[in-house]
């Protein structure tokens, strides 16, 4: 199966078992996202690395990966709308999320960026690149395909989150057993608890109601055509990037390469950060 994936991508599929203005694009974002910008001395041609988190997350989720590059690159980390400390909105789709990030890029007068996005953040990064390809030098997508996903894959998660909202616990310790009644995965429970906020009406920093109401938009995808050099990093045990979809991926991203990390799932950046860092470094060093 690996060799089939290689041939379809027509480039090397690495397999390790060891070891961020198109004049015609009108940006409608009215509020700036919450962001942290770590700037280092660099030449004018060195792009800024922008890290974009996934669903239910925040800017800290890719922090370990970002820190590995902070000595030689300026780093921009953001909270997407309805996440972290960014603004809440009833509307949410990839056009809007991409425009939000582009607004921050323009606010900071960045001329060249490298986008690194995980899951929903990966789709946002792909949409940004499609809207403003002249801004993006390279694109790195962690465990996400440019494909629509069918069904309601986070039903247990939403059930647990709404159960917490209805129960109004006073702290994480009280919220945990409520979540565990619906969510069997301890890692997912701990991930959700990171965003617990007793002062929020939803009991979480993310906008639970908006995420639920816009879930179909988050799972959806409109085809693009992007020639930017792109790296897809796949968790070996994850089904978000499927070998049988490689031709459809290449139709949208003809300059894509792929890298799989065995023994890891959808949160590959948290499970095997050293491998993800190594894959990104190798991709960034390619001319």
UniProtKB/Swiss-Prot annotation:
One Pfam family from the record: Abhydrolase_1
Ranges where the AB hydrolase-1 domain occurs: 47-273
Lineage: Bacteria, Pseudomonadati, Pseudomonadota, Gammaproteobacteria, Pasteurellales
GO MF, one annotated term: carboxylic ester hydrolase activity
The protein's enzyme class: hydrolase
Active site: 119, 266
EC code: 3.1.-.-
Signal sequence bounds: none
InterPro entries hit by this protein: AB_hydrolase_1, AB_hydrolase_fold
Keywords: Hydrolase, Serine esterase
Organism whose genome encodes this protein: Haemophilus influenzae (strain ATCC 51907 / DSM 11121 / KW20 / Rd)
Protein's recorded name: Putative esterase/lipase HI_0193
Annotated transmembrane regions: none
Family: Belongs to the DmpD/TodF/XylF esterase family.
